[in-house]
Amino acid sequence: MNWLTNVVRPKIRNILRRETPENLWIKCPDTGQLVFYKDVEQNQFVIPGSNYHMRMGAVARLRAIFDNETWYDVALPEVVADPLKFRDERKYADRIKDARTKTGAHDAVRVGFGKLETSPVVVAVQDFDFMGGSLGMAAGEAIIRGMELAVEKHAPFIMFAASGGARMQEGILSLMQMPRTTVAVQMLREAKLPYIVVLTNPTTGGVTASYAMLGDIHIAEPGALIGFAGARVIEQTIREKLPDGFQRAEYLKEHGMVDMVVHRHDLRPTLARLCRLLTKSPALTVTTAVEAPAEAAAKAEPEATTTEQPVAPAPTEPPAQPAAPQA
């Protein structure tokens, strides 16, 4: 009987049991309500009702920004994976391996080149799911390569920052990326190219002491945590209670640290408008002409109808194939 109850019956139950995905529902951190994950995903990871902005992966960011959800993944320089042979509770190499398996990304920063409302742009995205979006050698090289490509293509550079700071497992090599990325920003300025930074939740630590706060325009998502040190550390240092909302996007806007707070649904048109403004490109216009009856009849004839649409030239340098939309 033990064989029947302990072996056969559990196997039958496993066969008949309906599999339920672990991420079928998602809980809003603000209100606690349970929301269907697909609804949140289709809403650009904004909780319906509460408008709470969830963290957004690099691929989802790029899909939301580029025309037709298509872009070129920029080939990034290879770096030494574990230069210090660092180990705490686990080997750093094992942590990197797990993060790559979890996110499908090589490191915390992904760079894409494509069109934003028909204008070429270079976009770099930090993925907080990859070791907290920490800034290491690979991330620093990715950001610098993205800025170099922007100069080569004479295109605006857009940076989506989301990080807990420098990657401690790489020590001084990680901290060295702060001045290196700062020098790369100066390269954009000398080329007179727009550098727009989108500060997402959270943007803290060393990135706020380098490239994340050096943009021509700083945009923050609603409710984003932005700052160098944590609020508790500051309170213990100055021995004072911090005001409500300290280090949040809205507080920083009121005190002049960011230029605007933009809802995620409005981010793409806002970025496109800023790029056109800063590059002095003509605005997109939609015109409706009233045609004479004779002209309308002539255009109705198949042999007289011509449909000409501008064809964007294919990028010449960025490598590999266009990144296909990912579910």
From Swiss-Prot:
Signal peptide stretch: none
Gene Ontology cellular-component terms listed: acetate CoA-transferase complex
CoA carboxyltransferase N-terminal domain sequence ranges: 24-293
Pfam families in UniProt: Carboxyl_trans (PF01039)
Keywords: ATP-binding, Cytoplasm, Fatty acid biosynthesis, Fatty acid metabolism, Lipid biosynthesis, Lipid metabolism, Nucleotide-binding, Transferase
Protein name listed in UniProt: Acetyl-coenzyme A carboxylase carboxyl transferase subunit beta
Family note: Belongs to the AccD/PCCB family.
Stretches with biased composition (Low complexity): 293-311
EC number(s) on file: 2.1.3.15
Organism this protein belongs to: Rhodopseudomonas palustris (strain TIE-1)
Region span, Disordered: 293-327
Gene3D superfamilies linked to this entry: 2-enoyl-CoA Hydratase, Chain A, domain 1
Biological pathway: Lipid metabolism; malonyl-CoA biosynthesis; malonyl-CoA from acetyl-CoA: step 1/1
Chemical reaction(s) catalysed: N(6)-carboxybiotinyl-L-lysyl-[protein] + acetyl-CoA = N(6)-biotinyl-L-lysyl-[protein] + malonyl-CoA
UniProt GO MF annotations: acetyl-CoA carboxylase activity; ATP binding; carboxyl- or carbamoyltransferase activity
Subcellular location: Cytoplasm
Class of enzymatic activity (EC top level): transferase
Ranges of biased composition (kind: Pro residues): 312-327
GO biological process, one term: malonyl-CoA biosynthetic process
Record InterPro entries: AcCoA_carboxyl_beta, Acetyl_CoA_COase_Trfase_b_su, ClpP/crotonase-like_dom_sf, COA_CT_N
Subunit structure: Acetyl-CoA carboxylase is a heterohexamer composed of biotin carboxyl carrier protein (AccB), biotin carboxylase (AccC) and two subunits each of ACCase subunit alpha (AccA) and ACCase subunit beta (AccD).
Protein function: Component of the acetyl coenzyme A carboxylase (ACC) complex. Biotin carboxylase (BC) catalyzes the carboxylation of biotin on its carrier protein (BCCP) and then the CO(2) group is transferred by the transcarboxylase to acetyl-CoA to form malonyl-CoA.
